[in-house]
Amino acid sequence: MSRGELEAGLEAGIAALGLDLTAGQRGQLLDYLELIQKWNRVYNLTAVRDPQEMLTQHLLDSLAVVAPLRRHTGGAPSSLLDVGSGAGLPGVVIAIACPEIRVDCVDTVAKKAAFLQQVAATLRLPNLRGLHDRVERLAGPYDVITSRAFASLADFVAWSGGALAPHGVWMAMKGRHPDDEVATLPVEVEMFHVEQLRVPNFEGERCLVWMRRRS
């Protein structure tokens, strides 16, 4: 699939999501996709190999959280931690789309953290860092902590709670509404909002689960 075809698909997806991204940001997203493809030949960053599927399942899926995230932050400078980031999803996409947000992507696998560091350098993203560490060891504080297919909600908040700012929130990307997982959240954590995400060209269910410490 040519870059031009991927660019057309990205443009259509961005329009469907109602996002306003510059030509430079769109170019960075395509460059990022190419970096994933290049590194994936040597390192197993993602099981998805087809460029069109990468566009939909990785870029557009991650872009779907940008509008809800901006609504929460109000466009103000803030900090975000992406836990179990892997190839940088959604962290790298957020760093590109939201330059006002300082994004740290943490992964326990050294080669994935090295890839994230390479992405930050190659795409010249001063607001992006790749960290090789365990989330339990990070102090933060982060205004938003996110994850995409990382762990159960209970484990996610337990492992990352030490890095959350006093008035911070967790933003978990999930498939269908995780009723069973919500029921096992610790008593000191409340789910205060769940919203359905509409990912262009993706037929499965996607939702965003927002959580915070009880006041």
Q: Which residue stretches match the model-derived regions?
A:
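Class I SAM-dependent transferase core
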Residues: 1-75, 111-114, 118-126
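Residue-level signal for inorganic ion chemistry
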Residues: 36, 94, 173-174, 211
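Conserved SAM/SAH cofactor-binding pocket of Class I
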Residues: 60-147, 157-158
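Active-site capping/gating segments
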Residues: 101, 176-215
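Conserved beta-strand segments of alpha/beta enzyme cores
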Residues: 102, 127-129, 169, 190-193
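Hydrophobic pocket-lining residues within nucleotide cofactor-binding pockets
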Residues: 135, 150, 199
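A short glycine-rich, Lys/Arg-flanked "PGG" loop and its adjoining helix->strand segment in the class I
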Residues: 157-169
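Conserved beta-strand signature within the Rossmann-like core of class I S-adenosyl-L-methionine
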Residues: 167-177
